[in-house]
């Protein structure tokens, strides 16, 4: 398992723990704020371009133990910024100041630094930010949850997007990841020695439009 997938699994674990503690993922901003509060972090919404954001969309101040984020966009977009900074705290220990200049909630995994060739094309900072973005998306919209809603409960991607207050493109990308990628750490889930295969791109795309 690579570091990116490990980060996503940790985000899913935190999502489930937050839900178990009473968090409501259909209210993404409140959900992200609750996780920050549970970690003793102060969170402040600032106007776009505020000097304290240091030219970014969100920052983490390790000395103050606080997250500052740009107060614009939907609740989901603001929650994503907070969750992105939480990724730095959870995965890196919160020992470094961070300025997040840009985020891509609907980033395709093909754009992430997976494999030697792609990693060589990325600098350390870019790889780090990709991982935090995927952490944030997994925290707000875990793949197993979306797969369950879509495949077993029959919800369309539009219905899931409405339930979580998330952009449709983000939900569809996360669903594609859930349907196309093999589940991590599931040895021999189908019979002795067998491994369940992920859906093909065509099959997954067909499911998304149903």
Where are these regions (language model features)?
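Active-site hotspot residues in diverse enzymes, especially metal/ion-binding acidic/histidine motifs
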Residues: 1-210
């Amino acid at each position: 398992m690579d570091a990116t997938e490990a980060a996503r699994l940790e985000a899913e674990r935190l999502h489930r723990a937050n839900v178990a503690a009473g968090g409501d993922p259909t209210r993404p901003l409140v959900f992200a704020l609750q996780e920050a509060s549970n970690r003793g972090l102060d969170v402040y919404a600032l106007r776009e371009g505020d000097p304290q954001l240091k030219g970014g969309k969100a920052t983490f101040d390790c000395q103050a133990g606080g997250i500052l984020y740009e107060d614009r966009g939907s609740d989901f977009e603001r929650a994503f910024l907070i969750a992105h900074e939480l990724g730095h705290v959870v995965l890196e220990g919160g020992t470094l100041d961070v300025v997040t200049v840009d985020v891509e909630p609907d980033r395709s995994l093909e754009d992430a630094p997976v494999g030697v060739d792609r990693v060589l094309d990325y600098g350390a900072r870019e790889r780090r930010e990709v991982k935090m973005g995927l952490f944030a998306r997994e925290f707000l919209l875990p793949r197993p949850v979306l797969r369950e809603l879509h495949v077993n409960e029959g919800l369309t991607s539009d219905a899931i997007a409405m339930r979580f207050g998330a952009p449709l493109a983000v939900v569809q990308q996360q669903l594609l990841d859930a349907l196309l990628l093999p589940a991590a750490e599931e040895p021999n889930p189908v019979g002795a020695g067998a491994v369940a295969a992920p859906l093909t791109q065509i099959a997954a795309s067909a499911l998304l439009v149903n």
